[in-house]
Amino acid sequence: MGKIIGIDLGTTNSCVSIMDGGKARVIENSEGDRTTPSIVAYTKDGEVLVGASAKRQAVTNPKNTFYAVKRLIGRKFTDAEVQKDISHVPYGILAHDNGDAWVQTSDAKRMAPQEISARVLEKMKKTAEDYLGEKVTEAVITVPAYFNDSQRQATKDAGRIAGLDVKRIINEPTAAALAYGLDKKGGDRKIAVYDLGGGTFDVSIIEIAEVDGEKQFEVLATNGDTFLGGEDFDNRVIEYLVDEFNKDQGIDLRKDPLALQRLKDAAERAKIELSSSQQTEVNLPYVTADASGPKHLNIKLTRAKLEALVEDLVKKSIEPCRTALNDAGLRASDINEVILVGGQTRMPKVQQAVADFFGKEPRKDVNPDEAVAVGAAIQGGVLAGDVKDVLLLDVTPLSLGIETMGGVFTKIIEKNTTIPTKASQTFSTAEDNQSAVTVHVLQGEREQARFNKSLAKFDLSGIEPAPRGMPQVEVSFDIDANGILHVSAKDKKTNKEQKVEIKAGSGLSDEEIQRMVADAEANREEDKKFHELVQARNQADGLIHATRTAITEHGSKVGGDVIGKVEAALSDLETAVKGDDKAQIEARTKTLEEAGQSLYAAAAAAEQGGSADAASGNAQASKAADDVVDAEFTEVKDDKK
C-alpha cells in the first residue's frame, strides 16, 4: 500500500505533508518552498502555470489567473458571497447551467472551481511523488470545519479530477489539533483552535484526552464563516487605496484589471509588512494613465489605519468563538490552550482580539501555515495503520433535516453531532390519498426552510392511498466520516424505499467529473510534451551559444569547409528552435553537436601542428647554443677617471 499524503488545500496557499519515520514531514515543492500559492494561470501559448510561477505573471495576465477559487467551490452563482466576490477579482465568474458559480478565461473557456483546485492538488501530488520517488494515489484533504455538504462533495470531486482517491475529508481546525496535540503530554485538556486563513474562518473547541491508553481528539463544537479571511482584509486595503487615488486623481482603478491586480499584490505586501512595522508605503509607478499622461500611486499606510479598516472583520470572527463555547457548554476560562492557525493570525490586532476574548495568550509554537497539512498527514497515517492509538471524533458543523408542512425546517441531525452518525424520523402525508412525497433535504440553522442550504430533492412514490396523516414515511439520515450525507425515505407499510447520496443539489455530475478527469489526464500529457519541448529548445539554445563562441575563438585556425558545415548546421538548428517540432530540434541539435566536434578536432589539430613547428625551432636554437665555446676571461680594471 502506498503512502496516504495529507493536503491542506488553502484559499491562498496549499501545503502537503507525509508521515516519515513516525513523524509528519512537510515537503518542499519544486521551487524549494514549503507552501504553494493556490493560484492557476492559463497563458496565451496554452501553458498551465500553478503556484509561484502563476503568481509571478498575474499582473500581466489578470483575466486568466485564478486565485481564491476555494471561496466559490460548491456555491451557487446567486449566493451573496459570490456576487460580492465578482467586483473584487479581475477574472470572470458566471453561472453554469445548473446554477453553480464557474470561472471563465478571457477567451471564454468555462471551468468549474473544482477544475482549478484540481490543478493545485496535482501540484501537491507531484511534490509528494518527487520526494517519495513513487506514485501517490491516496490523500486526506482538509476543508474548513464550516463547509457545508456541497462544498465537501465539491472538494472530493476536485481530488478525483486530480487523480487522487480521497480517503478522508478532515476539518482544518481538527487537523491542526492533531498536529499540536499528538506528542503533547500533560493529561486531559480542552483547546480552542482559531483558524483564520486566506478565505475562510473556523473555530473549534476540542477535548484531548487519554482513554484506555488511546489519545482521543473529540470535537465538542465548531462554528465559523466560510467567507471571512485574509482576502477580505486585502480587499479593505485595496478599497482604501482605490478611494484615495480616486480623490487625488479622479480615476477609478476598479475598472482597470491590470491596475487591480497590481493593487492586490501591493495590498497583500503592505498588510504583511504592517504586522512587524508601524508604517509602510504603497508605491506603484505608472499604475494607469489618462490624456494628461501616466499616473503614479504613492500612499502611506499605518498599522493604526489598517486596524481601523479591518476592525469589524476582526470582531466578526469573535462571535463564532462565543457561539462555539456556548454550544460546547463551556466558558472561556475552561479553555486550557488557544491555538492560532492560518496566515491572517499573524496580524497583531487578531492575536490581541483572541487573547482578550479567551483571557489568555494564544500559543506561538504552532506553525500557522503548516499545522493543518501536518494534521492531515497524521490522519492519513491513522487510516494506513502507521499511527496507532489515536481516535478522532469530529462533528457535523450544521444541522441537517427536511422541509415539512408550512415551509418549516425540521432538524433530524443537530449541529455538533459526532460523526459518523445515523438518525431517523417518521413523517406522514399532508393530504388525503397522497401517493407520493417529496423529500427536500436542507442544511442550516434557520427555522424557515427557505433560508437554509438546499442539498437535494427526491420523490418517494407508490404510497398506498390513505387519509392524510395515516401513511408512515421514515426518513433516515446517515453522515459518513467525511461529513457527507446519505438520505433514504421508506414507506413503512409497503417497504418501498428511495435512497440518495447527496450530490450537492447542483454540483458536478459523474459525466462532468469523468470529462474533467480525462481532460486533466490529457493536459498532464500535454504539459509533459510542452516541458520536453522547452527542454529541447533550451538545450539547443545553449549549444547555439557555445558553437558561436567556438567559431569566434577557433574559426581562424580551421579550413573554410569545416566552418561552412558548422554554420549550415547552426542555421538549421536556429530555424528548428523557432518551431514546435521537438524531434526536429533534437535531430538538428545532434547534427550541430557532430559538426561542432569536427570544428574542435580541426582546431586541436591546427594547434598541435603549431606546437610541432615551435618544438622544431626550439631544437635548432638548442643546437646553436651547444656550438658556443665557453672562454676564460680576465677582468680589466680601468683606472682612468
From Swiss-Prot:
Keyword Cell inner membrane among record annotations: no
Induction info: By stress conditions e.g. heat shock.
UniProtKB keywords: ATP-binding, Chaperone, Nucleotide-binding, Phosphoprotein, Stress response
UniProt-listed CDD domains: ASKHA_NBD_HSP70_DnaK-like (cd10234)
Pfam families recorded: HSP70
Chain positions covered by the region annotation Disordered: 605-628
InterPro entries: ATPase_NBD, Chaperone_DnaK, Heat_shock_70_CS, HSP70_C_sf, HSP70_peptide-bd_sf, Hsp_70_fam
A GO molecular function held by the record: ATP-dependent protein folding chaperone
Biased composition (Low complexity): 605-623
Phosphothreonine carried by residues: T200
HAMAP family (alphabetical): DnaK (MF_00332)
Function: Acts as a chaperone.
Recorded family membership: Belongs to the heat shock protein 70 family.
Protein name listed in UniProt: Chaperone protein DnaK
